[in-house]
Amino acid sequence: MSQIYISRTGPPGEVSERRPQPRPVPGPGEVLIRMKAAAINPADLNFIEGTYGKKPVLPCVPGMEGSGVIDSVGETVADSFPNLTPGTLVLPLASPGNWSTWRVLPATDVLALPAATDPLQAALLRINPATAWGLLHAAAAPAPDSWVVQNAASSAAGHCVIQVAKSLGLKTLNFVRRPESIASCLAIGADLVFLDDADGLTAAKAALADAGAPAPALALNAVGGDSALRLLDLLGIGGNHVTYGAMARQALKVPNGLLIFKTLVLRGFWLSRWQESLEPGALTEIYLTLARLANIGRLQQQIAATYPIEEYLAALTHAATSARNGKVLLTF
């Protein structure tokens, strides 16, 4: 039984350490979780480096996503939370802290998942599926059969957008960097996929015209630079352009004419802040909806590899590789 911790920020492979972890005892109102799996996300690596929007309070255990099984519960839990019983698969809602064999959390920070949920897919529910849901609801929710356009469609978040949008009755127009990424997007329900360049933009406009489709009302930008401008070009009057990433590391420079004559709305999205804005209970319902989609095969995330926690250094190296095909997870 062990956990990964950091006492300083820096390169993840240098500042992350593994230490033994004795089995804790939950107090009143708490549950003890035996973790099953935890994701290694780019946000986790940035968190360890000290470059994420939320700075670590040192020393700490990283890990924003994970799933586990309740091992035992403290006093009062059985009466107040009858669904949190030993053996129940749960989603820890408090983070960081998931790169650990054991977690003790208040019962209020734990969500019981449907029994059929795959623990590996459950460990990937908190960030990308929730991001997709939040992005699609960041502005006024698009009407069924309306079009949403996005770049970085082959990313984990992009794949989630395609699948969640499909479950909501929306159509997606997607841009990818590489030709080999087109098939994977179509396989999970993308309606249209084009290369993210000038020719791709021309082809996208022609495809929308051929379909008799109105201009998209929502664009989701994870890249920035010229790619973000192509999304703006496709939006209709009054459309919303939501930025949640900056993969190209290029500033978003918007021509005045697009803002003036199309009255576009530009906004940012950060998952943590969006979650804080939700009404009590809303986040629980969102995660349960996402879990149900995962259970019926309509929301699946690709997994590149799993590593036992003892091999955390190899896992960190793999997770930092841009060429990996899917998510990297620690198992316990």
Walk through the language-model features, giving the residues of each.
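NAD(P)H dinucleotide-binding glycine-rich loop of Rossmann-like/cofactor-binding domains
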Residues: 89-152
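N-terminal Rossmann-fold cofactor-binding loop
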Residues: 175-179, 222, 245, 270
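Glycine-rich phosphate-binding loop and adjacent beta-alpha segment
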Residues: 226-298, 331-332
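C-terminal capping/lid region of NAD(P)-dependent oxidoreductase domains
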Residues: 213, 298-305, 313-332
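Glycine-rich beta-strand-centered segment in the early N-terminal region that forms part
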Residues: 22-39, 51-97
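Mid-domain Rossmann-like dinucleotide-binding core that forms the NAD(H)/NADP(H) cofactor-binding site
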Residues: 126-198
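Short amphipathic alpha-helix with an adjacent loop that forms part of the alpha/beta core around
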Residues: 200-214
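Short, well-ordered loop/turn sites that connect or cap secondary structure elements
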Residues: 81-84, 142, 235
